[in-house]
């Protein structure tokens, strides 16, 4: 270590302590010893730049009262680790309840069918404008690639608000069917739709695993020379399986809502999906793909999303490639908050998503 580097780190450490001391002196918690213990904040830094942080994250006043109430409800301790079967059972139960709520709030027509041999739900608006009947959206649900956390939860509101047909795809899940099985399923559905719709009249979107799969499908289509769709919705996307990002270290996905908890380094959830594929494969990890010529893309995340870093990094990559890419970051909310319809922020986010597809998926 050079003397200059040592001095710089010493100054950084001293500044950190001074800032923390000033904050503690001004914060109401410093008025009592019990509160002071609760609100202690500080940081130290290791030689390699790793930060050891204890911090205060107050309830933000910058979100809606509904969001404040909801965030407060997420403070209970995590449940014990679940088996895959338990996770799927719990996710299915939650999804059924939330899907029923989606259809109550955003009525649509629903037809269960298969497309290109893949199970799909066909959603159509109750009041379907004739001008929109040449457009279609493909929805890819979230759920960590090993369960279904949002097929109707995501597709129903967008169908209702955008007044565009949505095909929700039940792609094969890991670990029984690792990469590229899910990509193959969606590509098959997309190619089937190309028999009826022009590429520019098709949009693809999803949340979390569904957003990642959306990007993977686009990368595979581009690599194979298949015409790309007219628009992509990448809502909390994970485009790089080769390394964890800063926000993944700060926040961990705990159940569906997410909480402020450290990532468990002993649990590599990507392995079951990625299998033996090279983590730098440009389809598995689209951050390494040639993004030139990709369609207009909307990326949505939030400041307590474990995929905040991933989403913003992919947005920058798209911009570098000259893609028309928009990024919207919501304040203080966790991963996939737009699954929770009671939040005003959810209503805004869903409206933005619907408007994006109405604007970008050509008639």
Task: Please state what every model-predicted region is.
Residues 83-87:
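Accessory substrate-recognition/RNA-binding modules or partner subunits associated with SAM-dependent
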Residues 89-113:
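A domain-start/cap signature at the N-terminus of enzymes
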């Amino acid at each position: 270590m050079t003397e200059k580097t040592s001095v710089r780190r010493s100054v950084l450490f001293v500044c950190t302590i001074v800032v923390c001391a000033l904050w503690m002196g001004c914060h109401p918690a410093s008025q009592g010893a019990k509160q002071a213990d609760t609100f202690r904040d500080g940081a130290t830094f290791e030689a390699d730049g790793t930060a050891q942080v204890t911090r205060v994250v107050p309830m933000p006043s910058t979100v809606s009262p509904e969001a404040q109430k909801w965030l407060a409800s997420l403070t209970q301790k995590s449940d014990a680790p679940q088996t895959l079967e338990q996770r799927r059972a719990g996710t299915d139960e939650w999804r059924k309840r939330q899907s029923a709520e989606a259809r109550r709030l955003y009525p649509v027509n629903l037809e269960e069918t298969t497309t290109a041999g893949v199970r799909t739900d066909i959603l159509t608006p109750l009041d379907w404008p004739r001008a929109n009947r040449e457009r279609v959206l493909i929805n890819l649900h979230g759920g960590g690639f090993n369960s279904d956390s949002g097929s109707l939860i995501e597709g129903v509101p967008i169908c209702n608000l955008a007044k565009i047909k949505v095909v929700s795809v039940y792609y094969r899940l890991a670990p029984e069917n690792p990469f590229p099985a899910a990509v193959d399923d969606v590509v098959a559905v997309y190619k089937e739709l190309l028999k009826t719709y022009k590429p520019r009249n098709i949009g693809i979107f999803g949340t979390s695993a569904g957003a990642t799969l959306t990007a993977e499908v686009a990368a595979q289509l581009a690599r194979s020379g298949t015409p790309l769709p007219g628009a992509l919705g990448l809502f909390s996307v994970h485009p790089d399986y080769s390394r964890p990002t800063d926000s993944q270290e700060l926040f961990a996905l705990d159940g569906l809502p997410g909480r402020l908890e450290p990532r468990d380094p002993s649990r590599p959830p990507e392995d079951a999906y990625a299998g033996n594929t090279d983590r730098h494969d440009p389809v598995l990890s689209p951050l390494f793909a040639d993004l030139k010529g990709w369609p207009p893309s909307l990326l949505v995340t939030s400041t307590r999303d474990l995929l905040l870093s991933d989403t913003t990094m992919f947005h920058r990559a798209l911009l570098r490639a000259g893609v028309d890419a928009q990024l919207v970051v919501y304040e203080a909310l966790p991963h996939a908050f737009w699954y929770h319809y009671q939040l005003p922020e959810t209503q805004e986010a869903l409206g933005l998503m619907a408007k994006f597809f109405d604007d970008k998926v050509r008639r």
